[in-house]
From Swiss-Prot:
Quaternary structure annotation from Swiss-Prot or TrEMBL: Interacts (via MYND-type zinc finger) with HDAC1.
Matches recorded under Gene3D superfamilies: 6.10.140.2220, SET domain, Tetratricopeptide repeat domain
Transmembrane segments: none
Protein name: Protein-lysine N-methyltransferase SMYD4
Consequence the record notes for mutating V553I: In strain: Czech II
Effect upon mutating G397E: In strain: Czech II
GO MF entry, a single one: methyltransferase activity
Length: 799
């Protein structure tokens, strides 16, 4: 996903193994980017490019004239099954493969409008109706579309427009009575029904505008930090010989305080599951729903009404504005490279986009500093002592003068000492060139070389054909492949340590269930220069959340003045043990973690955390040991082999998965019976706070909620809460999500005092971690408003 597809990696590893040792040594011992890039690039042969071209053709993003009909029929099948979301996505795939101003695209837009109507997305439905008309929607089908348009307008309260649409429809039917009698009669009944509906709406009082609290709350930082763009005045940028650049608190900070709000300098949406290779005969077209089908490829906004790129079938956007911005900034170059970029991976794609978004003359100037001084490690390896000289390319003379009269500027800062979210800061992020394996450097360098050659070929073709399509690839940019390639290679190496996973909270649950499970999904890979200043801790004092491409960093606890502000890079103490955390951080980020959590765990005796622990079948005390586990209760002599307990746990997990499948397929009663058997088995050898017991209780809560047994569901959520709290802590975002679920159950069960209490607890925690713009916080506030409404009269909880 981040790196090239396995076939290309394997191919290059074989090529690396076949190289003479002298060539391997040249690349392995290279100290500059140009010393890595130039020898590697010279090794890229025509047969290598042909192999990569064949691989890329398997992930083609060209429009297929036969695809719209297939996707429309698949969408129709889902529509008949009332799976309207899946239907909308399939119609969108049809739109993406359609040519403008064809019946194919107009029918796909029209059908998608029907799916959006059933999902209550009336504004999006109206836009699709307009698009269908613009692309030549057949006149014979227009009356049906006008009825749908009227229904949308009525539901939106736009009654004058609804009346005009009805009038236009009646005039059209009178002027061209082409419908068969039965269809005409059905249409007339629909028209009369809509007229009555409009009259009823007109007698209702004006709707009250949505409360301001339901709108997106401004989370501006207030007064601007003059040292760091996008940061609050509560933080300051410092340097340290061991820590490097890092952020510290300038005052005492309270939980929930906003510290950094930064838009990604670059982000690339992750395709999710890779598209099936087109040589797979069993499925020529992919019907799977991935993140690439649900989110705007520029701003990452969730949308079912995607706007397609006019030239490829892959890129999709939330609006014409986003599509045009993407085209102007980078997609005009990337569009024809779609299959190649999918093959080379997200990191290569991000590296290309980072360079495209920079001012090209700056890129040339920066990387020429590296390439012109092939023998100098001072400018090519920013880890070296002449750090400032390597970075301050914006005004080198002024910087040298400044360093004579005082402290040198912090790397990435401009001549005024400000660190911004710009290419200068991006370039200052460390690539750790010497720490990457020789094989990894070779794979990256060859991949970038192949991309550069294709860029040059596209540029020559564009000039020959005088095509504006690839105008972003300027002749100057492709004139020197060393400059272009060295910049992208640097960025590709930077990304292993500096890329940020942009995530979103995904709510899942069966169609019948009103309560939802929350899980974090990775949407995109982004680069955030300011967020990258945060050092890691396995027990961080901040929470990072995302709204589209904007990262928000909040204090997760009290942070004292002078204390370092820390972020978790992924390996968190509540998710994995110290040994696994240390291994992951060392292999990906090249450092040995010495945070408080790692230090405390190393000092403790090696014992499994309670959420992974086994218990004694006799006295329920925790078991301890390595290959053979003994009861921790001194008066109990019970012992058992670890392998035996692990085998039992694996069998139990399979049984839980079977129960979850029953729940997903609409069989809650059977799921309950299966889960109760699982719970009985689990309690005989697992600790009361074991994660699997939490999953069982969560499944029972879902099943009872599906059946409307709200109080029983709430009781199981309470037990699941105990497991989550043991693992993640009482103030964690995970507890916030679980309390949100409890609030939903109690709200639906009309248990007013209990629901209000759960809402208050959930909101208090989620505000700290996610802020007031969180969807869950908004829903909690809506539930509270409803419960406190004087007109709300509970009829007693449903059992």
């Amino acid at each position: 996903m981040d790196l090239p597809v396995d076939e290309w990696k394997s191919y290059l590893l074989k090529k690396w193994a076949s190289l003479p040792k002298s060539v391997q040594d040249t690349i392995s011992t290279a100290e500059t980017l140009s010393d890595i890039f130039l020898p590697s690039s010279s090794l890229l042969q025509p047969e290598d490019e042909m192999f990569l071209k064949e691989l890329s053709s398997s992930y083609s993003v060209e429009k297929d004239n036969d695809a719209p009909l297939f996707y429309r029929e698949e969408g129709n099948r889902k529509f008949q099954e009332k799976e309207y979301t899946d239907a909308a996505v399939l119609y969108s795939k049809g739109v993406s493969h359609s040519r403008p101003n064809t019946e194919d695209i107009s029918l796909c837009y029209a059908n998608r409008s029907a799916a959006l109507f059933h999902l209550g997305q009336y504004e999006a439905c109206l836009k699709d109706i307009v698009e269908a008309g613009m692309h030549g929607y057949p006149e014979r089908l227009q009356p049906k579309m006008m009825v749908r348009k009227t229904e949308c307008l009525v539901n939106l309260g736009r009654l004058q427009e609804a009346r005009q649409t009805i009038s236009d429809l009646e005039s059209s039917l009178t002027a061209k009575p082409t419908l068969v009698l039965s269809s005409y009669q059905i249409l007339q009944r629909n028209v009369q029904h809509l007229k009555i509906k409009i009259q009823e709406k007109e007698t209702l009082p004006e709707p009250i505008p949505a409360a301001l609290t339901n709108a997106f709350e401004d989370i501006a930082l207030g007064e601007e930090n003059t040292q760091i763009s996008g940061a609050s005045l509560s933080v300051s940028l410092c340097t340290h010989p061991l820590k490097g650049r890092h952020l510290v608190a300038t005052k005492d900070i309270l939980p929930g305080e906003l510290l950094v709000k930064e838009d990604a300098f670059v982000s690339v949406l992750i395709p999710g599951e890779m598209p099936r290779p087109h040589h797979c005969l069993e499925n020529k077209w992919d019907t799977r729903v991935t993140s690439g089908d649900l989110y705007c490829h520029r701003c990452l906004k969730h949308t079912l009404a995607t706007v397609p790129c006019g030239s490829c079938s892959y890129a999709k956007y939330c609006s014409q504005e986003c599509m045009q911005q993407a085209w102007d900034l980078y997609h005009s170059t990337e569009c024809s490279l779609g299959g190649l970029l999918l093959t080379l991976g997200v990191f290569c794609h991000v590296a290309l986009r980072m360079t495209l978004l920079a001012r090209f003359e700056d890129v040339d100037r920066v990387v020429r500093m590296l390439c012109d001084e092939v023998g100098s490690t001072d400018t090519c390896l920013p880890e070296s002592k002449n750090l400032v000289k390597a970075f301050d390319y914006t005004s080198q003379g002024e910087s040298e003068e400044k360093s004579k009269i005082g402290e040198p500027p912090i790397p990435g800062c401009n001549v005024n000492g400000k660190y911004g979210s710009n290419y200068n800061a991006i370039f200052s992020l460390l690539p750790h060139t010497e720490k990457h394996s020789p094989e990894h450097r070779f794979i990256c360098a060859i991949s970038v070389s192949a991309l550069c050659r294709q860029l040059k070929a596209d540029s020559v073709q564009a000039q020959t054909l005088k095509s504006p399509k690839l105008k972003a690839v300027t002749p100057g940019l492709c004139a020197d492949l060393t400059v272009w390639g060295a910049a992208m290679l640097r960025h590709m190496l930077q990304l292993q340590c500096n890329a940020q996973a942009i995530t979103s909270i995904c709510h899942t649950g069966s169609n019948e269930s009103i309560i939802t499970n929350s899980r974090q999904i990775r949407l995109a890979t982004g680069i955030f220069p300011v967020v990258s200043l945060l050092n890691h801790s396995c027990r961080p004092n901040t929470s990072v959340s995302f709204t589209g491409t904007v990262a928000t960093v909040r204090a997760a606890q009290r942070i004292a003045k002078g204390q370092e502000i820390l972020h978790c890079y992924g390996p968190h103490e509540s998710r994995m043990g110290v040994a696994e955390r240390q291994q992951r951080l060392s292999s990906q980020y090249f450092f040995d973690c010495r945070c408080g959590a790692c230090h405390a765990e190393t000092l403790r005796a090696a014992a499994a955390p309670r959420w992974e622990a086994f218990c004694c079948k006799t006295c329920r005390a925790l078991m301890q040991g390595n290959d053979v586990l003994s009861c921790s209760n001194e008066s109990c002599t019970n012992s058992v082999s670890r392998d035996q307990l692990v085998s039992r746990l694996q069998d139990l997990q399979q049984q839980v998965c079977m129960a979850q499948k029953l729940l997903r397929t609409g069989k809650p009663e059977q799921a309950i019976q299966q889960l109760l058997r699982c719970r009985e088995a689990a309690e005989s050898f697992l600790s009361a706070e074991h994660t699997v017991l939490g999953e069982i209780e969560d499944g029972l809560a879902q099943a009872h909620a599906t059946l409307g047994n709200w109080l029983k569901s709430a009781a199981h959520v309470q037990k699941s809460l105990q497991v989550v709290e043991t693992r993640h802590g009482p103030s964690s975002v995970e507890i916030g999500h679980e309390l949100f679920k409890l609030a939903q159950v109690l709200f639906n069960g009309l248990a007013v005092p209990e629901a209000l209490s759960a809402i208050w607890k959930a909101e208090r925690i989620l505000l700290v971690h996610c802020g007031p713009e969180s969807e869950e916080v908004r829903e909690l506030r809506e539930m509270r408003s409803c419960l406190l409404d004087s007109s709300f009269v509970p009829v007693g909880p449903l059992v």
